[in-house]
Amino acid sequence: MYKKMIDILKAELVPALGCTEPIAIALASAKAREVLGEMPDELTVECSSNIIKNAKSVVVPMTKNLKGIEAAAIVGLIGGDANKKLEVLTTVTEEDLEETKRLLATGFCQTKFLQTTEKLHIIVRMKKGENSSLVELVKTHTGIARIEKDGVVTFEEEIEDCDDSTVDYSVLSVASILDFANQVDIEEVRPILERQIEYNTKIAKEGLRNTYGVNVGSTLLDVYGDDVKIRAKAMPAAGSDARMNGCELPVIINSGSGNQGMTVSLPVIEFGKMLDVEDEKILRALIISNLIAIYQKSEIGRLSAYCGAVSAAAGAGAGITYLYGGNEEQINQTIINTLANVSGIVCDGAKSSCAAKIASAVDAAIVATMISLKGKGFLSGDGIVKDTIQKTIDGVVTLAKEGMQETDEVIVKIMLN
């Protein structure tokens, strides 16, 4: 089981440059250009509603200020390197950017709504005379399921709900996660977690220093002061400020999301520093926070109308409770307290206001932690709270997957009209 847990961390905690939905579009486009082997005359991108929602209003990385599906597809075509996966746009040059802007102005890229049961689904088609290519990406941000050249399928693969199909999420439960975090040889996971600390702290500090979006992170510190409870919210919010508004620094993601990767890690890091605990304890707390978030999202799915900052913040709260010396019952109660409070936050796409939602979710997690450390918490029958942690999480999964299905459709309609 321990090896499977380590495999999950290795598969999930990977670097990504910029918001992952436009990156996924750029990746599919770069791959389609590679398959075609020449500059196309026509480019068409078909996207599921959740991809449209998450790519519509966020700045595409490496483009400075370009937003939207067309920009992501064109810059991926012109300057992307599909071999770099989630860092596909690290090769983009100024010349590539100028050509992207020129093609955008001509209406070169056509976009279509893709009728599909999948939340994460992209099809990119290119044509050059009689030649054509097609790349289909489904379920995960790097999950290329089908490639066609001149109408002939050259590659086809069944995609699992994780970028690494060998990963087994069935081992995850709150109890198994806590057992693993307490007993694993920390040296086996240290490089993964220290990279998360390094990358995510760096972009958070960038978001605090400079102007990105509405600067939720720095505003929190300016108005409320430099207290750990404020820093724990301000750091991930600042990272999101930067990431949603074109910052080119990479982030270590969680569950396919940079915002969730920052939400799940930075509050734990800040409380660890304030409590002056040993580095190893911070790393073990990060194991808990990351895996609790992954556990929830592995059931909910990568994209949903349910805001992923909530599941990430619940994980962060669990990690913070661990840092305070909380026992298993208190960690369980922290997760329950968080989910009882903010499970109603909806996802209306990737954009500047994600930073504010992160701050709200982390605030709820901090409150949840302090309540649980006092031996208190919301009880079975308090709304969606059930009599066990497992049943409570199962209920939230049902809420996110089934209850919010129509919510998701209505959100997309509002955004597009």
From Swiss-Prot:
InterPro entries assigned to the protein according to its UniProt record, in alphabetical order: Ser_deHydtase-like_asu, UPF0597
One BP annotation, GO: L-cysteine catabolic process to pyruvate
GO terms for MF: L-cysteine desulfhydrase activity
The organism of origin for this protein: Lachnoclostridium phytofermentans (strain ATCC 700394 / DSM 18823 / ISDg) (Clostridium phytofermentans)
Protein name (record): UPF0597 protein Cphy_1256
Record family assignment: Belongs to the UPF0597 family.
